[in-house]
């Protein structure tokens, strides 16, 4: 018999993560690499595990992630968003706790575009009055 699989898509900045949850031991695989190998920063790995901590499901599911775009922080946020959405399929009762923790909300903040005549989005050359 086929094993239950739960899917979720997460987004953050320019990163898009497609997440699959399979009942297992808590192993997280990102782009066919172990999460410790793929994301070197321990604080970002804690971000990824937040949905499991909120729902008290640590070590209950193996996570398989395909993530593209963005950097480490954006990808970690996208993975967190995808895991939270997949956990909703596992048990709809998780919605209240995940929503209260702010894990189901897509973070709409994006990089501000560079404007012509400026060095960056807001950085201008020094203003001289006279």
Swiss-Prot record:
Alphabetized Pfam families for the sequence: Ribosomal_S9 (PF00380)
Protein name per the record: Small ribosomal subunit protein uS9
GO-annotated molecular function: RNA binding; structural constituent of ribosome
GO CC entries: cytosolic small ribosomal subunit
Record GO biological process: translation
Keywords tagged on the record: Ribonucleoprotein, Ribosomal protein
Matches recorded under PANTHER family: RIBOSOMAL PROTEIN S9 (PTHR21569), SMALL RIBOSOMAL SUBUNIT PROTEIN US9M (PTHR21569:SF1)
Family: Belongs to the universal ribosomal protein uS9 family.
The species this protein was found in: Streptococcus equi subsp. zooepidemicus (strain MGCS10565)
InterPro entries: Ribosomal_Su5_D2-typ_SF, Ribosomal_uS9, Ribosomal_uS9_bac/plastid, Ribosomal_uS9_CS, Ribsml_uS5_D2-typ_fold_subgr
Gene from which this protein is expressed: rpsI
């Amino acid at each position: 018999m086929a094993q239950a699989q739960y899917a979720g898509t997460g987004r953050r900045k320019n990163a898009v993560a497609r997440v699959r949850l399979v009942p297992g031991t808590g192993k997280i695989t990102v782009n066919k690499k172990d999460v410790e190998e793929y994301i070197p920063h321990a604080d970002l790995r804690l971000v990824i595990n937040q949905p499991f901590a909120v729902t008290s499901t640590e070590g209950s599911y193996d996570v398989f992630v395909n993530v593209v775009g963005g950097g480490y922080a954006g990808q970690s946020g996208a993975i967190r968003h995808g895991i939270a959405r997949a956990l909703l399929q596992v048990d709809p009762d998780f919605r209240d706790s995940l929503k209260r923790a702010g894990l189901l909300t897509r973070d709409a903040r994006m990089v501000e575009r560079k404007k012509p005549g400026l060095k960056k989005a807001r950085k201008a050359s020094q203003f001289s009055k006279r």
